[in-house]
């Protein structure tokens, strides 16, 4: 399986989901399936904002493997938020599921039963976005 020629550097505090979307924009990929095929080698992948999985496949395709799994999961997903009060065993299971699995990490961590649900769209602070654009 071929690797990616280009992948944008992850910005401080940036979610992996954002970097994946940025890769699509910068690469001219307009189809979500085309983007997943480019990133994972398979079009049937589903990107999640907070707890992505199959990261071993993605890491294996990146042009620079500086983004080690622990750094990627710990620094660019919401893994820390969802696992802050979980046992070490459950945190390790979630990490492994995100790294190599295709199962639902949300289900494993009990996040699929939240009554409030998840927002229908991503939210952001316009002032913060301007500051980030200036900084990066």
Ranges and model annotations:
Residues 1-119:
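A structured, charge-rich N-terminal accessory region that forms the first stable segment of a protein
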């Amino acid at each position: 399986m071929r690797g990616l020629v280009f992948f944008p550097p992850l910005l401080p505090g940036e979610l992996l989901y954002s970097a994946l979307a940025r890769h699509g924009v910068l690469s001219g990929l307009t189809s979500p399936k085309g983007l997943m095929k480019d990133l994972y080698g398979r079009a049937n992948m589903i990107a999640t904002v907070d707890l992505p999985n199959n990261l071993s496949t993605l890491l294996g395709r990146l042009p620079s493997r500086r983004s080690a799994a622990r750094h990627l999961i710990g620094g660019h997903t919401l893994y820390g938020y969802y696992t802050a009060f979980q046992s070490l065993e459950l945190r390790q299971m979630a990490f492994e599921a995100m790294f190599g699995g295709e199962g639902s990490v949300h289900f494993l961590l009990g996040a699929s039963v939240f009554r409030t649900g998840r927002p229908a769209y991503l939210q952001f602070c316009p002032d913060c976005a301007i500051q980030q654009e200036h900084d990066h």
